[in-house]
Amino acid sequence: MSLREPVELLDPSAVGPVYFIAIGGAGMSGVARIYHDLGVEVRGSDQVDSANLRDLASLGVQTWVGHDPSHLAGARTVVVSSAIRPDNPELVEAHRLGLRIWHRSAALAALMLGREGVSIAGTHGKTTTTGMVATMLDCAGADPSYVIGSPLAATGMSSHLGGGEAFVVEADESDGSFLQYPSQIVVVTNVEADHLDNWGTPQAYFDGFVSMATRPEVRYVVTNADDPGAAELACRLESTGTVRVVTYGESEQAEVRLVDLDLNGTTASATLVYGPTQGRLELQVPGRYNLSNAAAAYCVGSLLGISHQDLLTGIASFTGTLRRFQLVGRVADVSVFDDYAHHPTELRATLGAARRVVTGQGRVIACFQPHLFSRTRDFAGEFGSALTLADRVIVSDIYPAREDPIPGVTGELVHDAVIAAGGDSRYVPDKQDLPEALAEEVRPGDLVITLGAGDVTLVGPVLVGLLEGKA
């Protein structure tokens, strides 16, 4: 199904019972939960059991492990994600029965009808910025609804149905989902070519952001003045005069400026200047990139009428989202972190933050699992260069996600690129071997970080267990 054109949306109360294929996924489970909280009958299945599946079942949602056409009995609407293949037996049955079939983005867009929609978009930083906005509004008493791609560390929740006017969503550009959301406020953290397997060319990818930002209901577009792609988008939009553009960043041209940055270990702070108003932005998460994300969140809150001090207080309470520089454990003076970074720019930002956390003779050891064959093919050299920010690199084979293999494309391309860029790398293709390989490498004072959008996240807890056994 094409996501380049908006689909007809119906009020959520008119579409049930709703059946979610792959209901246990990070994105799907959050949407399913809000439909359930609205009183819509929700059911769904997934290939494997998971905490998300069990959480939904505990709420009374009927769930199955495994896909079977019989599960669709009584359903009126079927919700799928881009990861669902056309030959999925439940999707085939939905077509045969003539049921309404919505992409996840349409199901989420329907929830935003009648609300003050806020879409957080950008190649990098969407999840964290969405989490910051949700936390900030909640602390200010605005009780927002939100759907985030990863659970908030403080609550373990990736979605919430609030009683306030604001509905904040992480707007994914990878498959064109962000074109569906009816939003009055749009944030673009950055624009850097990615997902070319779907968009084809960098220009088409950029034009997708233009299309999202020029939907008829958009009133404000918040853009990062420090990012070339977002700055180009701002210029394009300002020339049309159809929306109000608000810029943020360290640039002197930014409307909301960050100055006097302090990047200190696992925290960060800066002075935020907005016209005659200024105050200290204090974060519990590390990195220059997170200060940028916080400035974006501040802009959104200001546009929604939240006071300056409430904004600073709310953002200061944000403790992160899962899989974003998340501490897995500390054993024998070895720190183990996990991060979702899966693009060269994200690797550079995350490893840069890691270097500021490690102290003394400690090393940064990066364990990277490339995500998608097409992305590995397109960015192998850039991955290699970015990973040289680590003192030691272990590269695993590719997590395929939705893609079929591409001949000659393996994780070894990234390993070779690290070596070519002057880095120190080891290729361990089987992810089952990664915990032991890392345990052999570490010494007191080291920081280990697993990196990637796939199942490399499972490595950290196993590594911590191995290190505890040796302690």
Curated annotation (Swiss-Prot):
Instruction: Please give the GO cellular component terms listed in this UniProt entry.
Output: cytoplasm
Provide the residue positions that the database annotates as binding ATP: 122-128
Q: Which UniProt keywords apply?
A: ATP-binding, Cell cycle, Cell division, Cell shape, Cell wall biogenesis/degradation, Cytoplasm, Ligase, Nucleotide-binding, Peptidoglycan synthesis
What Enzyme Commission number(s) apply to this enzyme?
6.3.2.8
Q: Which GO terms describe its biological process?
A: cell division; cell wall organization; peptidoglycan biosynthetic process; regulation of cell shape
Top EC class per UniProt?
A: ligase
Cysteine pairings via disulfide bonds: none
Question: Record's Gene3D superfamilies?
Answer: Mur ligase, C-terminal domain, Mur-like, catalytic domain, NAD(P)-binding Rossmann-like Domain
Q: Pathway listed for it?
A: Cell wall biogenesis; peptidoglycan biosynthesis
**UniProt-recorded name of the protein:** UDP-N-acetylmuramate--L-alanine ligase
Species source reads Cutibacterium acnes (strain DSM 16379 / KPA171202)
